A protein has these predicted regions:
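Helicase motor core with emphasis on the C-terminal RecA-like subdomain
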Residues: 2-113, 117-386, 391-399
Length: 399
């Protein structure tokens, strides 16, 4: 393995900066880039307690990052502890983490906000050196992002010394995301954007089907044989759908015609923790032929065996489509391959438009809006649990 130029650039520049936004295509190694500065720092100083907080929009991604970091840390014989804390974490583990935090903690925005509500939150975060926000482009402009932004502002109130690293896929306006990353800091002058050149364009097709595409409906049942044919021709395929109900129906219908007994699994947020973790583990080992998934597997998962993506239904935005396509060929300079299968004739038009926009590298416009008031109310309730509210200080945190 050899580090890419932009990964080295981040490590060299961040020592003199307060924050950095890394823009890189899917599979470009941006998550590893984000961890290089913390690892280099912890080798020099060997601190105790929480050193680096990594925030991911998905539980599956947080789990995947922990697995991917364990191996190199062991190989380099580094004395670094790393753990994951999400809604799936056992209560005994959560208690242990609260009393004896690991050096690297992988978590989600919701779990991070809950940690800030502890009476011991100031002590817990007092020595934090790095905050990494992965897939920041999916968080910065929705209610989860509003809550996360408030949490980061409170974290800056607790500890003014940590550095922030934002990791993002290619977007149309990186400066807007950098502004969000630095909101509340007044440190924009001491930050940078590091951009990795884009890869080869993905290979996307809309398969011709022998059956007529229906005028209405969203099941995609007419294309079952086409889907199974694509699965048979590839090592591992992820079939993305837009709803959990759609994933359940498709899974059952595929099994009815799965005469070759391909190992096909299902993954969505309503499944039990044990079921989801088992699917993720089997995928990481390359044991599954296909997985039918919702947005629960949209982001960042590093499964090298995946060589094809099927998006069933119209893509909900160009950026999201590129993100999903990037699950295939998820490594440096491999071409991602995908098939778009519309569920009705109107979606056929949307699919053709989406392919055209991807080929022209026309990304979705980024809109930046004011935060939601209900999110502010939720944040204030959590903040009041950690300590009595000081009106002036609370105003500065929120502002």
């Amino acid at each position: 393995w050899k580090p890419h130029n932009y990964q080295i650039e981040l490590n060299n520049k961040l020592s003199n900066l307060n924050s950095a936004l890394v823009i890189a295509p899917t599979g470009g190694g941006k998550t590893l880039a984000g961890f290089i500065p913390p690892i280099a720092d912890i080798i020099k100083e060997a601190p105790k307690g929480l050193h680096t907080l990594y925030i991911s929009p998905l539980k599956a991604l947080a789990n995947d990052i922990e697995r991917n970091l364990e191996s190199p840390i062991k190989e380099m014989e580094l004395d670094i502890t790393l753990e994951t804390r999400t809604g799936d974490t056992k209560q005994s583990k959560r208690t242990s983490q609260k009393l004896n935090p690991p050096n690297f903690l992988m978590t989600t925005p919701e779990s991070f906000i809950l940690m800030l509500s502890w009476e011991t939150s100031k002590k817990f975060f007092s020595n934090l050196k790095f905050l990494i926000i992965d897939e920041i482009h999916t968080l910065f402009n929705d209610k989860r992002g509003d809550l996360l932004s408030l949490g980061i502002s409170e974290l800056r109130n607790i500890n003014s010394h940590f550095k922030k690293i934002g990791l993002s896929a290619t977007v149309s306006d990186p400066k807007t995301i950098l502004f969000w990353l630095n909101s509340g800091d007044n440190l924009n002058h001491n930050s940078t954007i590091i951009q990795q050149p884009k890869f080869l364009n993905p290979n996307i097709d809309i398969p011709k089907t022998k059956r007529n595409i229906p005028w209405s409906g969203h099941s995609g049942i007419y294309a079952l044989n086409d889907i199974l044919n694509i699965i048979s021709q590839n090592k591992t395929t992820i079939i993305f759908v837009n709803t959990r109900a759609q994933s359940e129906i498709l899974f059952q219908e595929i099994w009815k015609i799965n005469e070759e007994n391909f190992t096909i699994a299902l993954h969505h947020g309503s499944l039990s923790k044990e079921q989801r973790l088992r699917v993720e583990s089997e995928m990481s080992k390359g044991h599954l032929k296909a997985v039918i998934a919702t947005s629960s597997l949209d982001l960042g998962i590093d499964w090298n065996s995946v060589d094809h993506i099927i998006n069933l239904g119209a893509p909900k935005g160009v950026n999201r489509l590129i993100q999903r396509i990037g699950r295939s060929g998820h490594s440096y300079n491999r071409v991602s391959r995908a098939s778009l299968i519309p569920t009705n004739k109107f979606e056929l038009l949307e699919c053709h438009a989406a392919v055209n926009l991807v080929n022209k590298e026309h990304l979705d416009k980024i809109d930046y809006s004011d935060g939601a008031l209900e999110v502010l109310a939720q944040f204030l309730v959590g903040l009041s649990l950690s300590a009595p509210l000081d009106p002036d200080l609370t105003y500065r945190i929120v502002k």
